[in-house]
């Protein structure tokens, strides 16, 4: 027997496993929010695997309920399958429309079921959303364990030092803007900010975002932590990002978000 409920606060998941990987951005991602490219997924072995046929149906029930509450760009839900608790959260990118958010949830859940069948803990990232499913309830905590980075294959052609410095400054400025926004009802851009900076004849475009279960203080901590990885992951690259289940950033030399 399964049960489920919804609540506005999101759930961060404390987990055992850690996967770090580097990927190249695909050409299909280069358009302005026109695709929903798959980015990465993690099957969390530390939480175990559920035997039996009813578990996936119980998880689907939670996801189906969540799909009706996407006007804010995020939602979390909870339920159970016998003794196994089910917690799920969805965070859509703030510039994604409600229809794109709903479509991303459907795609993410369909794919994570194939990639990590019956896993209690599993996370999947797409260009437009993050879906995090777990058997462990931890509210408003930062997940430091499941972080990965991506970068554009192309290097900056000139003045790499100035490019790195200006990109870093832009990202930190966006972090401050994101955490200073007031949490108004149904505000999609809470804990999110996007902007651009001129670099001679070019511009760098960037965004930062935290999941909305975090406080502004924890959002700042999370973003500062992943921004500290910028030199190692993306130094001299025309584009790059670092993503976790709690926060992420991205920058490019082309516009990729709606402003």
From Swiss-Prot:
Chief localisation class: secreted
Entry keyword annotation includes Signal: yes
Keyword field: Repeat, Secreted, Signal
PROSITE patterns in UniProt: GNK2
Record's keyword annotation contains Signal: yes
Pfam families: Stress-antifung
Disulfide bridge positions per record: none
Subcellular location: Secreted
GO CC annotations on file: extracellular region
Signal peptide stretch: 1-31
Limits of the Gnk2-homologous domain: 37-138, 144-256
Family matches, as InterPro entries: CRR_secretory_protein (IPR050581), GNK2 (IPR002902), GNK2_sf (IPR038408)
Record family assignment: Belongs to the cysteine-rich repeat secretory protein family.
Name by which UniProt lists this protein: Putative cysteine-rich repeat secretory protein 25
Organism: Arabidopsis thaliana (Mouse-ear cress)
Record gene name: CRRSP25
């Amino acid at each position: 027997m399964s049960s489920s409920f919804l609540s506005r606060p999101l759930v961060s998941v404390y987990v055992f496993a850690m996967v770090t990987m580097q990927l190249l951005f695909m050409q299909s991602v280069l358009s302005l929010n026109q695709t929903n490219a798959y980015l990465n997924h993690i099957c969390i072995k530390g939480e175990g695997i559920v035997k039996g046929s009813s578990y996936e149906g119980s998880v689907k029930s939670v996801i189906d309920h969540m799909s009706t509450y996407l006007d804010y760009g995020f939602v979390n839900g909870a339920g159970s399958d016998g003794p196994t608790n089910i917690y799920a959260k969805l965070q859509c990118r703030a510039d994604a429309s409600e229809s794109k958010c709903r479509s991303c949830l459907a795609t993410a859940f369909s794919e994570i079921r194939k990639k990590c069948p019956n896993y209690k803990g599993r996370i999947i990232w797409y260009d437009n959303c993050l879906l995090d499913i777990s058997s462990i309830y931890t509210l408003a905590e930062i997940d430091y364990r499941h972080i990965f980075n991506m970068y554009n294959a192309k290097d900056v052609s000139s003045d790499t030092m100035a490019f790195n410095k200006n990109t870093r400054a832009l990202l930190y400025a966006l972090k401050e803007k994101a955490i200073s926004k007031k949490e108004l009802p149904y505000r999609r851009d809470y804990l999110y900010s996007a902007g651009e900076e001129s670099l001679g004849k070019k511009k760098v475009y960037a965004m930062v975002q935290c999941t909305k279960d975090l406080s502004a203080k924890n959002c700042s901590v999370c973003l500062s932590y992943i921004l500290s990885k910028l030199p190692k992951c993306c130094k001299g690259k025309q584009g790059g990002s670092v993503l976790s289940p709690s926060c992420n950033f991205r920058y490019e030399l082309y516009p990729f978000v709606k402003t």
